[in-house]
Amino acid sequence: MPKQKTHSGLKKRIKITATGKLMRHQAYSNHLAASKTTKQNRQLSAETTVHATDAKRIKRLIANMK
């Protein structure tokens, strides 16, 4: 049986914390920033945790990542 490979796309987009949580960048923050308020742009720049319902599936795809 071949080894499970780490998903290359997720490897670049997800960061694992020391406690095992998955961190991701938020959507809607890359362009058209002039039409958003300063508060929106500031809050969107922060990383957020992956929702618990998605975490199990994502952890399976990046199982070999440390």
Curated annotation (Swiss-Prot):
Q: Which residues cross the membrane?
A: none
One GO CC annotation: cytosolic large ribosomal subunit
User: What are the recorded Gene Ontology BP terms?
Assistant: translation
UniProt xrefs under PROSITE patterns = RIBOSOMAL_L35
Provide the alphabetized UniProt keywords.
Ribonucleoprotein, Ribosomal protein
Q: Which GO terms describe its molecular function?
A: structural constituent of ribosome
What family does the database annotate? Belongs to the bacterial ribosomal protein bL35 family.
The molecule here is called: Large ribosomal subunit protein bL35
State the organism's lineage.
Answer: Bacteria, Bacillati, Mycoplasmatota, Mollicutes, Acholeplasmatales
